[in-house]
Amino acid sequence: MQAYQRDFIRFAIDRGVLRFGEFTLKSGRTSPYFFNAGLFNTGSALAQLGRFYAAAVVESGIRFDVLFGPAYKGIPLASATAVALAEHHDRDLPWCFNRKEAKAHGEGGSLVGSPLAGNVLIIDDVITAGTAIREVMQIIKDQDATAAGVLIALNRQERGNGELSAIQEVERDFGIPVVSIVSLNQVLEFLADDEQLKQHLPAVEAYRAQYGI
């Protein structure tokens, strides 16, 4: 685990974004942990989050021309990542996002920001069912651009109804990498090393054994 990944897990726990307990997911599963990126909800938290995303971008080695943030949650994530790449990695890259509903007046259209062209890196928080990413892939295709990959905050490493996770299905169906700041494996590693949080390790390991990929 890289230092920035360990720092990100600590940051997520401190912000209440990553919590441990008993949570019912949309899938109906009872999970021993929950990740809510909406709680990165202050200026300083968003700035710090952007730096973690930027570190993961650099670490991934994915070559791309523009960042894309899917509405709505991906919009601040893509903008924060673009700022952090410019300020901390000397990479001043364009970024773009979509509107949920196309605008008929003013500049019009459903895209805001830089033109969506070339190789596109999609920035989002998590991939649960993969539905939102499939919609984004169509937007990119409609602009004659190419998806270069997807970057998310947490890979739950959890299968859906079949044998694959939603992330693996996206990788298979579109032939692109999906990378994350951290994965559940790294969260487990963090728990094992933390005396205060170690109590949650057995429940998370049991969940991973039952639903993991």
Swiss-Prot record:
Reaction(s) the record says it catalyses: orotidine 5'-phosphate + diphosphate = orotate + 5-phospho-alpha-D-ribose 1-diphosphate
Pathway: Pyrimidine metabolism; UMP biosynthesis via de novo pathway; UMP from orotate: step 1/2
UniProt keywords, alphabetically: Glycosyltransferase, Magnesium, Pyrimidine biosynthesis, Transferase
One Pfam family linked to the record: Pribosyltran
GO BP, sorted A to Z: 'de novo' pyrimidine nucleobase biosynthetic process; 'de novo' UMP biosynthetic process; pyrimidine ribonucleoside biosynthetic process
Disulfide bonds: none
Family: Belongs to the purine/pyrimidine phosphoribosyltransferase family. PyrE subfamily.
Residues in the signal sequence: none
Subunit structure: Homodimer.
Protein name (database record): Orotate phosphoribosyltransferase
Cofactor: Mg(2+)
Chain positions recorded as 5-phospho-alpha-D-ribose 1-diphosphate binding sites: 26, 72-73, 99-100, 103, 105, 124-132
Residues binding orotate, per UniProt: F34, F35, T128, R156
GO molecular function terms listed in the Swiss-Prot or TrEMBL record: magnesium ion binding; orotate phosphoribosyltransferase activity
Entry GO CC: cytoplasm
Domain of life: Bacteria
Enzyme Commission no: 2.4.2.10
Role according to the record: Catalyzes the transfer of a ribosyl phosphate group from 5-phosphoribose 1-diphosphate to orotate, leading to the formation of orotidine monophosphate (OMP).
Stored InterPro entries: OPRT, Or_phspho_trans_dom, PRibTrfase_dom, PRTase-like
